[in-house]
């Protein structure tokens, strides 16, 4: 039976250069582990959760996504590319040793100047009844009253605490010592923590929405119907099993055939540039990364941009260091098994795979490491297409762009290049490589995505690879993958269904008020800073005043005609999952490329409501932690509940707000002005002062060793997030203290706990980061992450906090109250 597919038009009709405005301001999602490029300069790559979920599809998600879910995709990669290296820069589960049993209800004692100070947070004799523990649905569905919600929260907090631990020795152990025992890592995950727990709750809600019957009044052109059809097609395993690999084989044939499957493949007609452009139309960047995004030096203008490629393993070191040989061998075995499932003989698959791996290893050698790409001002080169062709004459850039842009491209067209040396080295490498190997590699990177849209034989092979790479013991249930796919690719349609049923406007207004208070705290701290000159301080104040905040959701998602317009050219059928995915990828590519010629509209939403995370965009000077988060996103426990004591809300979502504000002034955010443009606006004196204080944090975190795997944290790569963590908690606590002074009569305690409001602030902050991760995933994250492990986000931040030391009466010189502290903001 001949299966249908969406063909690539090799000679598309031209479109006029001036594009009409679109309501998508961001469509491209980077390769989640290989460190791809600068494409996200305009996006929210400074996120709060970060890179804690290494099992997230390695480079399977290296395609356009409507709503860039960077909860782990900040990107997983080392930044072999500009953007991934600077995932927080450019503009986007905690390591914990399982503890022994604890004594419920114990108080602890410490000595301050030989005086015993009792700081019992858990009431004596308090016990926990697991049967009474509510799931997160109870919270965000609005069930319960003040008393019941607070009782439930107290039980949860007590459940995770190790009350035998001394908070002045190790506050993470004190706050989270029972987490691992109470929450073993599920077999389908590489790690498990608070965020993953929230996501599972959210995914269950989204599944219910997607499975609800389609109202009879809606037709197939309705965006929410298309989202439901996409979910149905993904879940219809009987059809997937019947079709097997045929849809992919047909598509590969249309693309010229995958040599590994075709011994008769003819190299004479092979055109690597054409195939690269064809794959780009399916939102896949291989060899060269191309995208349309705001110019980092003129954030109001969209421009074509190029950068180095991503790779198929987490970092270039996986290809280049002998210590990673086991992972490279597993990668090759994965490739061979996929090829044989698609019909290759074992002999041919093995021979071709060895050639392909050798080529990708050479490719890794010409990519730049993250350390080499820290100064993105030096990487930035703006030029015309004609000038680029002069510098790299082996590539017909006009032809490539004419295919991708679906219009004639002139030599005068401006482009920004972030990896000129890489591109020049690439064409030399290609000239020395057999066409068969290049074709094999290009299509392997494409096939690796597309097998996710086939039957479970391919998922079983991928699971074996992921077990070696991340330690994940089994693949997630199909419904979880399907929910993720629909929410990533049709996030606004899903968000429309979600917001109509669950969004809480009161939470939105309350959070906005908190944000204003925390912004005020930052301004006060900034004004008291002695190491910044007055002129720089004035400009920084202007920047924080200009910082915008998006809360909730864009209005258009509740207006069916506007929402339907967004997806009008996307054809979705309930029984064609493979073709549906291709249609979406092509749609997202068109939308992205169509941005060229338009002025950047910084008020547009590019994130969907139903996601758990928070973000700061340097190019827009904008916090959008809530555009993706609504009530079943990050505005739910432990971050927020309208019935919580204010201490928990400030220690939860308040710290998130402060974290994102501080990203505007971290090691990369400070380079962008109030309008989101990259230029030198700090005085030399202020720059020197910043570097001195940032170096203190770099050195501090670099001393932390993750005992489970015997590896140290990379203090340089994590500095931006560490700066944001340390600044965020200071601002949030300052705002909370002000609220306390104005609301002395409010009850800031929890039933069954004797903790003060200020103690609960820090305890809730710490419990946000309770979690554990498999050793394999831990090793990978320490090599690639821009966030410190959760344990050290707690210890590192609180050991620098004078407020924490005072609230918990920690003696000077104790581990959580060192004499020498680090502080930037």
Q: What do these predicted regions represent?
A:
Residues 205-518, 554-557, 566-567, 571-592:
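Noncatalytic, helix-rich "gating/capping" subdomain that lines the substrate-entry/channel surface
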Residues 163-167, 296-298, 616-619:
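Extracellular/periplasmic catalytic domains that process cell-envelope and extracellular macromolecules
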Residues 149-150, 166-169, 174-240:
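Active-site-surrounding "flap" and adjacent substrate/cofactor-binding loops of secreted or lumenal enzymes
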Residues 188-210, 346-366, 649-655, 754, ...:
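Short secondary-structure subsegments characteristic of cysteine-rich extracellular domains
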Residues 160-182, 317-341, 719, 725-731:
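Hydrophobic/aromatic-rich, well-ordered segments within soluble, folded domains that form packed cores
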Residues 356, 362, 382-397, 402-409, ...:
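Intrinsically disordered, low-complexity linker/terminal regions across diverse proteins
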Residues 2-136, 719:
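Long, low-complexity intrinsically disordered regions of secretory-pathway proteins
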Residues 139-159:
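Short, Gly/Pro- and small/polar-rich lid/capping loops
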């Amino acid at each position: 039976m001949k299966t249908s597919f969406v063909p690539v038009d090799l000679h598309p009709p031209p479109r006029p250069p001036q594009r009409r405005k679109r309501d998508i301001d961001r469509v491209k999602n980077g390769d989640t582990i290989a460190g791809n490029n600068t494409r996200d300069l305009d996006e929210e790559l400074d996120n709060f959760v970060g890179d804690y979920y290494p099992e997230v599809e390695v480079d399977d998600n290296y395609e356009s996504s409507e709503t860039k879910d960077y909860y782990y995709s900040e990107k997983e990669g080392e930044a072999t590319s500009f953007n991934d290296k600077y995932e927080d820069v450019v503009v986007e589960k905690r390591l914990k040793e399982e503890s022994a049993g604890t004594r419920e209800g114990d108080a602890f004692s410490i000595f301050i100047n030989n005086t015993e100070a009792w700081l019992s947070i858990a009431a004596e004799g308090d016990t926990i009844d697991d049967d009474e523990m509510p799931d997160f649905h109870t919270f965000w569905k609005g069930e319960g009253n003040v008393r019941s919600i607070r009782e439930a929260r107290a039980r949860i907090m007590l459940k995770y605490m190790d009350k035998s631990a001394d908070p002045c020795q190790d506050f993470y152990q004190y706050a989270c010592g029972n987490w691992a025992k109470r929450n073993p890592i599920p077999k389908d995950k590489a790690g498990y923590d608070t965020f993953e727990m929230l996501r599972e709750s959210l995914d269950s809600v989204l599944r219910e929405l997607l499975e609800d019957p389609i109202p009879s009044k809606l037709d197939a052109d309705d965006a929410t119907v298309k989202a439901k059809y996409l979910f149905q097609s993904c879940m219809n395993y009987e059809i997937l099993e019947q079709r097997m690999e045929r849809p992919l084989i047909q598509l590969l044939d249309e693309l010229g055939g995958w040599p590994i499957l075709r011994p008769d493949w003819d190299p004479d007609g092979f055109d690597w540039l054409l195939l690269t452009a064809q794959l780009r139309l399916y939102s896949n960047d291989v060899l060269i990364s191309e995208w349309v995004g705001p110019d980092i030096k003129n954030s109001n203008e969209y421009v074509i941009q190029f950068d180095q490629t991503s790779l198929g393993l987490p970092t270039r070191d996986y290809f280049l260091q002998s210590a990673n040989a086991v992972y490279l061998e597993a990668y090759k075995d994965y490739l061979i098994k996929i090829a044989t499932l698609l019909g290759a003989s074992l002999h041919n698959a093995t021979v071709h795979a060895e050639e392909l791996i050798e080529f990708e290893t050479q490719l890794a050698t010409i990519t730049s490491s993250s350390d080499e790409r820290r100064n993105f001002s030096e990487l930035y080169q703006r030029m015309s297409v004609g000038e680029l062709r002069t510098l790299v004459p082996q590539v017909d850039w006009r032809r490539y762009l004419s295919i991708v842009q679906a219009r004639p491209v002139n030599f005068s067209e401006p482009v920004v290049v972030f990896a000129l040396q890489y591109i020049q080295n690439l064409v030399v490498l290609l000239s020395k490589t057999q066409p068969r190997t290049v074709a094999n590699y290009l299509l392997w990177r494409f096939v690796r995505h597309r097998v996710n849209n086939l039957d479970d034989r391919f998922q079983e092979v991928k699971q074996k690879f992921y077990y070696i790479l991340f330690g994940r013991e089994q693949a997630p249930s199909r419904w979880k993958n399907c929910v993720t796919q629909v929410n990533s690719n049709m996030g606004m349609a899903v968000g429309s269904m979600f917001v109509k049923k669950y969004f809480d406007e009161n939470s939105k207004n309350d959070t906005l008020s908190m944000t204003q208070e925390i912004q005020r705290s930052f301004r006060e701290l900034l004004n008291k800073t002695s190491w910044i000159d007055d002129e720089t301080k004035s400009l920084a104040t202007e920047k924080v005043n200009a910082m915008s905040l998006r809360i909730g959701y864009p209005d258009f998602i509740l207006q069916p005609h506007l929402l339907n317009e967004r997806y009008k050219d996307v054809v979705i059928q309930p029984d064609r999952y493979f073709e549906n995915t291709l249609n979406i990828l092509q749609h997202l590519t068109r939308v992205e490329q169509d941005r060229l010629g338009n002025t950047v509209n910084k008020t547009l939403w590019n994130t969907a409501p139903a996601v758990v995370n928070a973000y700061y965009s340097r190019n827009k000077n904008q916090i959008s932690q809530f555009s993706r988060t609504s009530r079943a996103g990050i505005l739910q426990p432990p971050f927020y509940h309208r019935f919580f004591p204010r201490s928990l809300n400030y220690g939860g979502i308040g710290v998130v707000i402060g974290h994102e504000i501080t990203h505007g002034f971290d090691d990369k955010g400070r380079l962008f002005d109030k309008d989101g443009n990259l230029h030198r606006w700090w005085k030399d004196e202020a720059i020197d002062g910043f570097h001195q204080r940032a170096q203190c944090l770099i050195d501090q975190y670099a001393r932390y060793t993750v005992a489970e795997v015997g590896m140290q944290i990379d203090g340089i790569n994590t500095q931006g997030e560490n700066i944001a963590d340390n600044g965020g908690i200071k601002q949030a606590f300052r705002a909370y203290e002000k609220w306390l002074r104005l609301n002395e009569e409010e009850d800031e305690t929890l039933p069954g706990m004797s903790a003060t409001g200020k103690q609960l602030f820090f305890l809730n902050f710490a419990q946000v980061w309770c979690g554990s991760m498999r050793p394999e995933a831990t090793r990978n994250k320490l090599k690639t992450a821009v966030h410190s492990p959760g344990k050290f986000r707690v210890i590192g931040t609180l050991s620098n906090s004078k407020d924490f030391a005072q609230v918990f009466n920690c003696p000077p010189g104790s581990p959580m109250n060192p004499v020498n502290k680090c502080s930037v903001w």
